[in-house]
Amino acid sequence: MFTKKLETFFLTIILIAVLFLSKNYYDSYTFKINDIPDSYKKRIADKEQEILNLMQSHYGVSFKVPIIVTDKFKERLYGLTAYKNGEITIYLNKNVMRESMDYMVDSVIAHEYAHALIFKLGLRSTQKDGHSKDWEQACENLGSVNCEQYVNSQDVVMGKLPFK
């Protein structure tokens, strides 16, 4: 009798685990194949508006940069600002968004907008990593919670994206 109850108990646990794993797989799959949720879009738009207001108050200029959410990043790079043929574009990594949306909103968007501002103002330094003192100040002024360099100089892109 005890053996039968124990067997039923373990089978129940296995069934619950399989259901849990199936649900996680399904959620990950649907997130990957669909556009980001509207709640994410709103958070990105709200943060962008906050950054534009800070840009206007600190620098007397305000300009929007296209923000593209993509799953084409090869690594765990959170964001990237590309400057090519005079055009600036910010790319955000969809692959890390689900687990790090707060970080993306609190730090990454302003971090990337700081690069865009430095490009636009013509303050690019001779540093190859794109994280000069001017950039650091811009990052702080645009409201990033954390203005640190997260890539090494080999990963910085000036017109060449790490994906196709």
Stretches found by the model and what they are:
Residues 107-120:
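Active-site recognition of the HExxH zinc-binding catalytic motif
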Residues 3-35, 43-63, 72-103, 120, ...:
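Metalloprotease/metallohydrolase-associated module, dominated by Zn2+-dependent proteases
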Residues 68-69:
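Surface-exposed or secretory-pathway low-complexity segments enriched in glycine-proline
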